[in-house]
Each structure stands twice: as structure tokens, then as C-alpha cells.
A protein has these predicted regions:
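C-terminal accessory region of radical SAM enzymes
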Residues: 289-318, 343-394, 430-437
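Cysteine-cluster motifs in flexible loop/terminal segments that predominantly coordinate metals
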Residues: 378-424
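Local cysteine-cluster metal-coordination motifs and their immediate loop/turn environment
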Residues: 113-123, 325, 340-343, 381-399
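Long, charge-rich, low-complexity alpha-helical segments
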Residues: 35-108
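Canonical Radical SAM [4Fe-4S] cluster-binding loop centered on the CxxxCxxC motif
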Residues: 99-137, 149
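Conserved Radical SAM active-site core
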Residues: 127-185, 189-205
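Radical SAM enzyme [4Fe-4S]-AdoMet core and its adjacent flexible, acidic
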Residues: 1-3, 17, 178, 202, ...
Length: 476
């Protein structure tokens, strides 16, 4: 049984309070905190009556006057649970002063050379590209960043194919000695049993690209003859105890096969999906981009395969105002050039060179500061500024926007997918399985509360919270 608020308590007015429906459940979302709360239709109507002047007891009397038989105790329990979920918090957070931030994540491109030549590669990697610097240069760079970094700075080793870099192991060992957390992005083609043991020892996470369950599907984008080798590399890493993830880049061609990828992998290896984007060689493949509805359908299909419960990293009361590019994250090219993001390797976004300039001047420099300032979700555009999930989304992937329309301050081309998926995730965080709906739209709770109550449907439902026709679940 929930503890109850005092009936005389007056909940804050929530002018941006939004409601979304999935089946018999309703999500109440306060975008400004952000905070959310899942209830049924009756609970949603009660929350809508909070106008900043009515006490909980007043709200109960109003309901009773309209012939709705709900006990006061059940109403006070509902508002107590919503209060604990931070739904009625003010939701204002100050930002840290520029220059006080610490480096949290680095994409380290040891080389742009690769043993594959994928059709959509955003780095346009290929086998014949040069090696620009030695292992010692990158080891020095790792030490250079340490005074500016968090205790568990994440170094993502990438390329190209990072294992084609001479001295790969030496740079990795130096990163481990610095106390950094190592992550690896690889195509999985160069995983010998011995290397699998080395990777398992030094990397906390490995992401391997696999674009289909069969050679035919996989080879359409990544070249023929390597599907079996990639699967072998995945199994070797899994057998060595490494934490392996598989990433599938989704296009209309492999979309019908995405749900089969997990079947060819060890049970311990999860699958992640990302849409093909118009970056690098992918700019030539505009016809091969999936739309928002298709990506939503894929995500929901995966949710059903896991009983509708997928993890979410959203934290009530924690605002995501922007992508972390430049603010906490940077990318270092194989030339030593520093950029805010690994998908922003363009001259206009170059912040400096780690081999020739002091890192503090690069990281705290005016160019980076100006870039980060323009990344604020409320400064980007009118659509993001007024969006109900703006502080959960943070404005989406600015690289997607940059490469799609030429302006990173615009709206992510997968805005519809992001918004729907976040809503689904909030339901799941409260233990509610999400079922598919027709299209992207969902019903909303609109109109004056008094008129809404006149058409109120049956309150009978399975209860996960209190009785009395009010159902409630929270993310806590």
C-alpha cells in the first residue's frame, strides 16, 4: 500500500503535462523535469485536474460531483506516487561553468585503413590508405589528456579497422595503464584465438558489425566472403569471456532479415540496430534509407521478442540538453586532428591537433565553446524547443542532421522514431509492455477536464498499484 499525501496538498500546475496511451495504460510526462508516471485512464484524468489551485481533496470532490465513485484514499495515494516520481517538481537545473567540464569519452582513430570497403562507410575507409603516425604518438596523446579526464575516461579504439594499425597492442596497453576504460569498434575479421584473449583482458566492450544472418545479406554492403570469419571472431571473443555486442546497420535491403541476426549468434551476444545514414560513401545511397515507421516497427518487434522489457538509461530529474559532442566527448583522427564528434570530421569543425597543440587550448578553446553552445536543445530550432521529450532526447543525433540537410541545428531525420521509442522506453521503465499501434500516432488526453469526465469509460482494469479503479506504476 502506498503512503498518501495530505488531502490539503495543492499540486503544482503543470502547463506542459502531456499524456500518451499504450493499450489500457497512460503515460503522464512532465517535459521540464523530465519526469513520468504510468497510470490508467482514471489516473490520467485525476492528474489533469491539478491546476495549481485545487487541493487533492478538491480534486476528489470534483470527481465525486460528476458521479465517479473513487475513494479519497485512492486519490491521495495516486498523487503521492506521482509526487515520488518527481512529476510535480519544478525541474530547473543550472549548467556547469565552461572550463570546469571533464573529458569523459574519446573516439581514437588509429588509422583510416581497413581490410573492407563497405558501401556506406562514413569514414570512406579502404585497404590502401596510409598510416600517418606511430604508436608512440598516440601513447603520448593518451597521457596528454589525463589531467583533463574523468577517472574512468572511455577510449573507443576505432578506424578504419584499428587492428590494422602497427602497434595496436602497445597503444591499448598504454591506455589500460592510464586507468582508462577501453572499448573497441571492429569488423571482427582479425580475431585470432590469441588476440581474442588480449581483447578480453583489455576491453570492457567490443562492438562488431554484422549486417545480416547470412552471407548473401551481409555481403550486399560489406563485401563477399567474410560473413563466416566475422561469426568466428564473435565466437572466439565470446569464448574468451569478452563482452561483445553486434551492430547491424539497417537498410531496406536487410530490414526483413534483422530479426534473424540474433539466431546465428551466441546467446550472450546482444544485437543493436542503427539506420544507414548519408555519410561518407553512404551519401550515394539515398534510396537505401529506411523511414521512421519501419524503424519503429523493428524496435517494437525486438521489444516483443524480449517480453516487452528493454533497458532504458533515462533518469527522472536528469536533463539531457544536448549531444555530448565537444562538451564531454571528442574524436581524434588518425592525423591527430581533434573534432567534437567522430561523425563531424570536417574542416569547419576541426578544433586543433593533439600532436601539435596543448590539449587544454583545444578542449576549452573558444571554437569548441561556441560549438557546444549552439548544441543546446532549446537553442536549435522551434520544433526541438517545444518538443515534449526534448530533455530526454537532447535534440537527437546532430550528425544525422548535418549529413541529411547540411545543418546540425536542424531536426533529426529520425525524430519520429526517437520520439516514439523514448515514449515506449518510458512505459517499459515502469514495467509496462508495449504493443504495436497503427502508424506513429497515439491517442492523447485533451479538452477541459470537466467535459472529459462526462465521457469517461469503464475504470475496470488489472491493478499493479492501488485499488479503486486507479492503476499506477513508476520508474522507481
Amino acid at each position: 500500500m502506498y503512503k498518501s499525501v495530505d488531502p490539503s496538498w495543492v499540486p503544482l500546475a503543470l502547463p506542459e503535462l502531456t499524456f500518451r496511451q499504450r493499450g489500457e495504460y497512460w503515460l503522464a510526462l512532465n517535459p521540464t523535469v523530465p519526469a513520468w508516471f504510468v497510470t490508467n485512464y482514471a489516473g490520467a484524468l485525476l492528474l489533469q485536474l491539478a491546476d495549481g489551485s485545487r487541493a487533492v481533496a478538491d480534486i476528489h470532490r470534483l470527481i465525486v460531483d460528476f458521479g465517479i465513485d473513487i475513494e479519497l484514499g485512492h486519490v491521495t495515494e495516486l498523487f503521492e506516487s506521482a509526487k515520488k516520481s518527481l512529476l510535480f517538481s519544478a525541474g530547473r537545473q543550472s549548467e556547469n561553468e565552461w572550463g570546469s567540464q571533464q573529458l569523459a569519452a574519446v573516439h581514437l582513430h588509429l588509422t583510416n585503413r581497413c581490410n573492407l570497403q563497405c558501401t556506406y562507410c562514413f569514414r570512406e575507409s579502404s585497404p590502401g590508405l596510409p598510416i600517418h603516425y606511430t604508436a608512440d604518438h598516440f601513447i603520448d596523446a593518451l597521457h596528454t589528456m589525463k589531467p583533463f579526464a574523468t577517472e574512468n575516461l572511455k577510449i573507443t579504439f576505432t578506424g578504419g579497422e584499428p587492428m590494422m594499425f602497427p602497434g595496436f597492442e602497445s597503444v591499448v596497453e598504454a591506455s589500460t595503464e592510464c586507468g582508462y576504460t577501453n572499448l573497441l569498434l571492429t569488423n571482427g575479421m582479425l580475431i585470432s584465438p590469441e588476440r581474442a584473449e588480449f581483447i578480453a583482458q583489455h576491453f570492457s566492450s567490443i562492438t562488431i558489425s554484422l549486417d545480416g544472418p547470412t552471407e548473401e545479406v551481409h555481403s550486399a554492403t560489406r563485401g563477399r566472403g567474410n560473413h563466416k570469419r566475422v561469426l568466428q571472431g564473435i565466437r572466439r571473443l565470446a569464448d574468451a569471456g569478452a563482452k561483445v555486442h553486434v551492430k547491424v546497420t539497417v537498410s531496406p535491403d536487410n530490414l526483413p532479415y534483422c530479426d534473424q541476426v540474433a539466431k546465428v549468434l551466441p546467446d550472450t551476444v546482444p544485437v543493436q540496430f542503427t539506420p544507414m545514414m548519408p555519410m561518407g560513401r553512404g551519401q550515394e545511397l539515398h534510396r537505401d534509407f529506411i523511414d521512421n515507421d519501419a524503424f519503429v516497427g523493428l524496435n517494437r518487434g525486438l521489444a516483443r521478442a524480449t517480453d516487452g522489457r528493454m533497458s532504458t538509461s533515462y533518469m527522472p530529474g536528469h536533463r539531457s540538453r544536448r549531444c555530448h559532442a565537444g562538451l564531454f566527448n571528442i574524436s581524434i583522427a588518425d592525423t591527430g586532428d581533434v573534432y567534437p564528434c567522430h561523425l563531424f570530421h570536417q574542416d569547419q569543425f576541426k578544433l586543433g591537433n593533439i600532436f601539435t597543440q596543448p590539449f587544454g587550448e583545444i578542449f576549452f578553446g573558444e571554437q569548441n565553446r561556441s560549438y557546444v553552445k549552439t548544441m543546446d536543445v532549446e537553442a536549435n530550432n522551434d520544433i526541438c524547443r517545444s518538443c515534449e521529450v526534448r530533455f530526454l532526447c537532447g535534440g537527437g543525433c546532430k550528425a544525422n542532421t548535418l549529413h541529411s540537410i547540411g545543418d546540425y541545428r536542424g531536426v533529426d531525420r529520425y525524430c519520429g522514431y526517437i520520439k516514439t521509442t523514448i515514449t515506449d522506453d518510458l512505459f517499459r521503465s515502469c514495467g509496462v509492455a508495449v504493443e504495436p499501434v497503427d502508424g506513429m500516432e497515439v491517442e492523447t488526453l485533451t479538452g477541459r477536464p470537466e467535459s472529459t469526465f462526462l465521457g469517461m469509460p469503464s475504470m475496470a482494469s488489472k491493478s499493479t498499484g492501488t485499488g479503486g479503479g486507479i492503476e499506477m506504476t513508476t520508474s522507481a
